[in-house]
């Protein structure tokens, strides 16, 4: 209303001035010499009115409407989410959902959030669990700064869904530090210190990190294309772990810090376990592979993104790529020797791993490795043993649209075991063939397997004992494949191998299935749910773990993934995940000359140009 009154007053003033001139002793008359002056004055006032009317919309948005717990609320622009949530519980409400986006709980609302619904998210949500874990790492890093200011630490993801922390100072005894660090973390939590997200010029932030002797942070900032960057401030401590965090230290309550020589293990509530901390299980086979990956990255100086970039910028690029491929060749050679040493007993080679691990290319390379040792394997596809959907509907007692097509009961396990048993015993078998065009199972090829020819199978259930129950354990050789890159953005921010696989899948789906990045991201949680249910419970039963990561691959994938991810709009529900992937892909120096990559490389399965049928 005040704007409207101002508009009317200004209009009347202009009208009177232009028509009658200024009040004079002789009355309201306008001498000719004043006309041009009045016109000029009126023009200026009109300009003012135009500017005012342009701002009416802006003034109207001083207040926005939001929906909280089913109620419509009017709040001023700039209001924090934490201030509008009814019954806010800092230990329960970790992050929030604003419209389609997940935000921090103390996020400030703006005009673009007008009409959106807001709800808190607890630890049963994946993004809340991630923010919680990130904050826990932040607190532990802060505790080390407070108690042992000269000690440098590094975090990495570890077996049993945990985080591993080690001291980079060779002489530091981490076992003695466990109790002091636990006490300091508890003190910080009890103090309920505010955690504030800041945006600072890169130069100013670099000075802050330099004063704190955070050389790893400075290295990363040198590759940042933007002129400003985010950081988090808690008291006098600054750090950024490349993810959202909680509002204050007091939001953290449930966690575990235990010694695990030569470092410590950190555990936290997992969303897939309904906010429970998983029991720590010693996964010796898987853990050994992680340790080998860590040692190799350390020896070759490929532990962080800046180190990878320096290999590309300063060294011979072809040499770098061939070095990474040579490591895969060496692992395949180790695998071939292990199978050859027991070939008299091994009749079945079972290969499994999570999505986008490179299983198809790997199976072909295992076959060639065995051929080089005089062993002629036979490959059988588990896909050919799928039941038709009508049969699966009866088995699962569900309509077609609700079927769990990853369930083991979608496979004809009985027929598969019978065919395996007969083949291993030297009989001729006519295999089934599943026609995915018609959705029907038909007759396939007829084969007989020689005594020295192991059968290779690959699929999500390949390591499940139920699938191959007719074959004695000593006659099976199980292989688990997954990328286990022990690489960090910086010392406190390990790269998730899950995100690496998602980037691989985005690139593959675009290249071979004409599928946009948003669709792949939409499907990803369902893929992950299937992995937790059908793959991870059986990984420790593997006789061999193959690490399919290549230290240079994200430099190659970046050139394809980044443009696709940037097409996802802020208002799209996939934006949060897309933006997270963009945030660390942008730091990699791109490799654009794909001709340097061998045609049998595992990465060819995702970018194309493979010599194998993928």
Go through each PLM region and give its residues:
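Short, positively charged and aromatic/hydrophobic N-terminal segments
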Residues: 11, 15-22, 37-54, 58
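Auxiliary tRNA-acceptor-end handling modules of aminoacyl-tRNA synthetases
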Residues: 95, 99, 110-130, 143, ...
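Conserved NTP phosphate-binding and transfer environment spanning the P-loop NTPase/kinase superfamily
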Residues: 343, 465, 469-614
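Hydrophobic anchor at the beta1->P-loop junction of P-loop NTPases
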Residues: 349-351
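Conserved lysine of the Walker
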Residues: 359
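Hydrophobic positions on the alpha1 helix immediately C-terminal to the Walker A/P-loop
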Residues: 362, 366
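Short beta-strand-centered segment that lines the nucleotide-binding/catalytic pocket of NTP-utilizing
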Residues: 372-389
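Conserved nucleotide-sensing/catalytic segment adjacent to the nucleotide-binding pocket
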Residues: 392-435
């Amino acid at each position: 209303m005040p704007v409207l009154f101002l508009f009317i007053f200004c209009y009347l003033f202009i009208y009177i001035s232009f028509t009658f001139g200024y009040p004079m002793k002789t009355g309201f008359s306008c001498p000719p010499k004043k006309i041009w002056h009045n016109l000029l004055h009126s023009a200026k006032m009109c300009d003012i009115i135009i500017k005012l009317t342009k701002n009416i919309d802006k003034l109207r948005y001083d207040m926005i409407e939001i929906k909280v717990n089913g109620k419509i609320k009017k709040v001023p622009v700039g209001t924090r989410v934490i201030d509008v949530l009814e019954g806010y519980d800092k230990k329960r409400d970790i992050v929030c959902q604003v419209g389609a986006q997940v935000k921090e709980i103390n996020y400030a609302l703006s005009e673009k959030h007008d009409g959106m619904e807001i709800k808190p998210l607890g630890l049963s949500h994946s993004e809340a669990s991630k923010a919680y874990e990130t904050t826990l790492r932040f607190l532990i890093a802060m505790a080390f700064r407070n108690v042992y200011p000269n000690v440098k630490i590094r975090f990495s993801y570890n077996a049993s869904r945990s985080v591993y922390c080690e001291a980079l100072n060779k002489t530091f005894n981490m076992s003695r530090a466990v109790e002091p660090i636990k006490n300091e973390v508890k003190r910080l939590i009890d103090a309920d210190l505010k955690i504030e997200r800041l945006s600072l010029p890169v130069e100013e932030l670099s000075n802050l990190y330099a004063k704190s002797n955070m050389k790893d942070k400075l290295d990363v900032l040198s590759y940042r294309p933007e002129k400003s960057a985010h950081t988090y401030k808690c008291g006098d401590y600054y750090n950024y772990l490349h993810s959202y965090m909680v509002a204050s230290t007091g939001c953290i309550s449930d966690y575990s810090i235990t010694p695990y020589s030569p470092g410590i293990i950190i555990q936290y509530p997992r969303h897939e376990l309904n906010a429970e901390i998983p029991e720590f299980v010693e996964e010796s086979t898987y853990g050994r592979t992680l340790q080998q990956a860590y040692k190799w990255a350390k020896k070759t100086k490929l532990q962080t993104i800046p180190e990878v970039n320096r290999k590309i910028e300063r060294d011979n690029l072809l040499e770098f790529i061939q070095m990474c491929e040579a490591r895969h060749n060496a692992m395949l050679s180790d695998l071939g020797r292990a199978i050859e040493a027991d070939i008299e007993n091994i009749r079945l080679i079972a290969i499994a791993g999570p999505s986008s691990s490179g299983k198809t290319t790997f199976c072909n390379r295992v076959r060639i490795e065995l051929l080089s040792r005089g062993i002629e394997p036979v490959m059988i596809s588990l896909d050919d043993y799928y039941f038709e959907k009508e049969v699966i509907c009866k088995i699962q007692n569900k309509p077609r649209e609700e079927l769990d097509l990853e369930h083991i009961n979608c496979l004809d396990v009985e027929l598969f075991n019978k065919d395996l048993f007969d083949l291993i015993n030297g009989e001729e078998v006519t295999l089934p063939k599943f026609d995915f065009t018609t959705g029907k199972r038909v007759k396939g090829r007829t084969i007989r397997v020689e005594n020295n020819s192991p059968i290779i199978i690959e699929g999500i259930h390949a390591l499940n004992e139920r699938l191959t129950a007719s074959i004695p354990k000593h006659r099976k050789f199980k292989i688990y494949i997954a990328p286990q890159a022990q690489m960090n953005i910086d010392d406190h921010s390990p790269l998730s191998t899950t995100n690496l696989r998602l980037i691989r899948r985005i690139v593959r789906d675009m290249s071979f299935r004409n599928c946009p990045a948003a669709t792949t991201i939409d499907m990803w949680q369902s893929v992950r749910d299937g992995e937790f249910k059908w793959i991870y419970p059986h990984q420790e039963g593997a006789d061999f773990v193959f690490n399919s990561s290549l230290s240079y691959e994200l430099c190659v994938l970046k050139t394809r993934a980044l443009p696709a991810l940037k097409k996802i709009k802020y208002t799209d529900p996939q934006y949060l995940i897309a933006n997270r992937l963009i945030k660390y892909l942008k730091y990699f120096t791109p490799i654009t000359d794909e001709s340097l990559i061998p045609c049998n490389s595992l990465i060819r399965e995702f970018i194309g140009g493979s010599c194998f049928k993928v």
